[in-house]
Curated annotation (Swiss-Prot):
Enzyme's top EC category: oxidoreductase
Keywords, in A-Z order: NAD, Oxidoreductase, Tricarboxylic acid cycle
Any one GO MF annotation of this record: L-malate dehydrogenase (NAD+) activity
Active site: H191 (proton acceptor)
Chemical reaction(s) catalysed: (S)-malate + NAD(+) = oxaloacetate + NADH + H(+)
One BP annotation, GO: tricarboxylic acid cycle
Name by which UniProt lists this protein: Malate dehydrogenase
Family per similarity comment: Belongs to the LDH/MDH superfamily. MDH type 2 family.
Functional note: Catalyzes the reversible oxidation of malate to oxaloacetate.
């Protein structure tokens, strides 16, 4: 059966030889992001010196015989990767090494994402959508956005979907219900140990999760810190950071924007300009969002914070603000 394509999108993926990209690329080629009727002009980027590994990734994609892949190239040139793209998935980042402080990581990645933002500014389409995965993701996303003034600030996203998925699963397991019975899962703030999984907004079988779970102490003192520290727990258990789950979360995060479901809430880090919650402008901050018929998103308005959640959000806001201040001095 010949698949009829309705459109083709140009897509760049950085960090193309890494573990997350290795899982994500095949989901992308399969149609999990843009749908089964959308062709893909794919450019895979990684650093000079990794050409041989990139060629191996290309071999596997070629061998997968994906009908949606209309063109495929691997490159060590950001200009080549970002030229005329509709979407970029910025996965590559400097990893946090043993004994490395978060401030050291901010400095190293500040240079990487400043350059990538500058090249996006000169090379990508003005309405390109940019998804940042490399940590510290909120601040890396802000750096790239600040270096790309030609692009629409609203189209920069930092990934919080993995945190959302973790919370979704924990609530379903605790309530002993299928995953599709859980909705309105919200992550506020930074993707870090200070993120805010807001259980007060979540619904289980259409009822408030707080009522269904019936154990506020578990929500505050077991579930919340478990989600905040899940990444570290995976590293401790596996010896490596989350990869397959992160790739799936990235595909879902992008799909929520490109192929939205009616009324679906999704958590994503976006530019805080004109937000309805009083968060200072010019930050990348995690909000619950939903898509509009126009193809744009809106931050879900009108949600109330109890004292516990409000205090946690302030802590996360302080962290993001401090990270921004630190990189602004670089």
């Amino acid at each position: 059966m010949v698949m009829k394509l309705t459109r083709t999108v140009s897509v760049a993926v950085t960090g193309g030889t890494g573990q997350i990209a290795y899982s994500f690329l095949f989901a992308l080629a399969h149609g999990d992001v843009f749908g089964s009727d959308c062709g893909i002009d794919l450019r895979i980027y990684d650093l000079p010196g990794l050409e041989r590994v990139l060629s191996g990734v290309r071999m596997e994609l070629d061998d997968g015989a994906y009908p949606l892949l209309q063109s495929l190239r691997v490159t060590t040139s950001l200009e080549d990767a970002f030229d005329g793209i509709d979407a970029a998935f910025l996965i590559g980042a400097a990893p946090r090494g043993p004994g490395m402080e978060r401030s050291d990581l901010l400095k190293r990645n500040g240079e990487i994402f400043s350059l990538q933002g500058s090249v996006l500014n000169t090379s990508a389409k003005r309405d390109a959508k940019i998804f940042v995965v490399g940590n510290p993701v909120n601040t890396n996303c802000w750096i790239a956005m600040s270096q790309a003034p030609r692009l629409n600030r609203r189209n920069f996203h930092s990934m919080l979907r993995l945190d959302q998925n973790r919370m979704h699963t924990m609530l379903a397991h605790r309530a002993e219900v299928p995953l599709d019975e859980v909705s309105h899962v919200v992550i506020w703030g930074n993707h870090s140990a200070k993120q805010v999984p807001d259980f007060t907004q979540a619904l289980i079988s259409g009822k408030p999760a707080v009522e269904v779970i019936g154990d506020r102490d578990w929500l505050e003192n077991i579930m919340l810190p478990s989600i905040q520290n899940r990444g570290s727990a995976v590293i401790e258990a596996r010896g490596k950071s989350s990869a397959a789950s992160a790739a799936r979360a990235l595909a879902e995060a992008a799909r929520s924007i490109f192929l939205p479901k009616d009324g679906e809430w999704f958590s994503t880090g976006v530019c805080s300009d004109y937000n309805p919650y009083g968060i200072p402008e010019d930050l990348i901050f995690g909000f619950p969002c939903r898509m509009l018929p126009s193809g744009d998103y809106e931050i879900v308005p009108g949600l109330l914070w109890d004292t516990f959640i409000k205090n946690k959000i302030q802590i996360s806001l302080d962290e993001i603000s401090q990270e921004k201040a630190n990189v602004s001095l670089l």
